[in-house]
Amino acid sequence: MSGSSAKINLLGMNRSDLETFFESLGEKKFRATQLMKWMYHLGVSDFDLMTNMSKALREKLKEVAEVSVPEVIYEDISADGTRKWVMRLAGGNSIETVYIPDNGRGTLCVSSQIGCSLDCSFCSTGKQGFNRNLSSAEIIGQLWIAARSFGDYDLSKERYVTNIVFMGMGEPLLNFDNVVRACDVMMDDFGFGISKRRLTVSTSGLVPALDKLGDVTDVSLAISLHAPNNSLRDVLVPVNKKYPIEELLAACHRYLGKLSDKRRITVEYTLIAGVNDSETHAHELRDLLRDLPCKINLIPFNPFPNSGYERPSRNATLRFQKVLSDAGYVATVRTTRGDDIDAACGQLVGRVEDRTRRSQKYIPLQNINVSPDGRASV
């Protein structure tokens, strides 16, 4: 459970931060990696158990610091193996984290904010409004809790959590410093040792922050596109009015150009019945992404109360996918997981807290006009 704010929470500090911390105590830098091994390789949060540190140092740590994680207030496991946690943070707010097992790998979907300010019209989290950014400790705490649940500490053995995606609650690039620091810990061999190819940060398209991200880290990138043209994306993803599709795709090219290896952008496209799921939209998306090294993740919309939107039919989804596949794209349809535990982002925490305000903020489907050429207006 989150502890006293008077003490420094060492969870979520990257190696450089911890070295600076120990130097401030008059200790050598190597204490940082000692501590990281205890926290992340062994799952130990009690300083008294860290026996390769002197008793005097352990007493000093207890005076000024702590290893504090969020409090799990709800946990559920779906029939398909999907697992979801609702975690309470300092101040009483809650976040959610989802684990999805699939074909020999396990993906942990972590949150970066309490709520979200971008107000994408189809997103459950956005309807809850924005409260605050998560600290790096609160981000890493989600992975720490998952690792503890699975006993997932021995890096030499096959692990349950093999992939991490920042696709939970919030826009990661609006919490830039804490997300980057958390990524450092996730990838550090003295942290969780996650490969940069298996750690993905998703963004709705904050172009300046995306350019900055490429200067400080080399994680994999996903963009929440959801529309093949600006008029429709302005409605679904309002940040598009500030950073239109052309600027976003140019930023994606710049990001790939900064990487030391060849990788593709993951393009996320939520299919919404009667809004962006026609073959016209598929052809438009095909042409839009022609020059971008990418793979496309098609996500049938997961309805939530008062969303005003509907999931497309399976036939419509497969027709959309076929247009892209025939053009040579790797286009996968995300299998709906965890329906029996409200595993779609933002759904369960809203039900547990009973605090959502969806009915006041959604754009009703009947208020969106889509022309035959796929353009939209409200």
Swiss-Prot record:
Keywords for this protein: 4Fe-4S, Cytoplasm, Disulfide bond, Iron, Iron-sulfur, Metal-binding, Methyltransferase, rRNA processing, S-adenosyl-L-methionine, Transferase, tRNA processing
Top-level enzyme category: transferase
Keyword Acyltransferase: no
UniProt remark on cofactor binding: Binds 1 [4Fe-4S] cluster. The cluster is coordinated with 3 cysteines and an exchangeable S-adenosyl-L-methionine.
A Pfam family: Radical_SAM
Domain Radical SAM core: 102-340
Cellular component, GO, one term: cytoplasm
One GO molecular-function entry: rRNA (adenine(2503)-C2-)-methyltransferase activity
Residues reported in the UniProt entry to bind [4Fe-4S] cluster: 116, 120, 123
Binding locations of S-adenosyl-L-methionine: 170-171, 202, 224-226, 302
Listed name of the protein: Dual-specificity RNA methyltransferase RlmN
Organism per entry: Hahella chejuensis (strain KCTC 2396)
Species classification: Bacteria, Pseudomonadati, Pseudomonadota, Gammaproteobacteria, Oceanospirillales
Name of encoding gene: rlmN
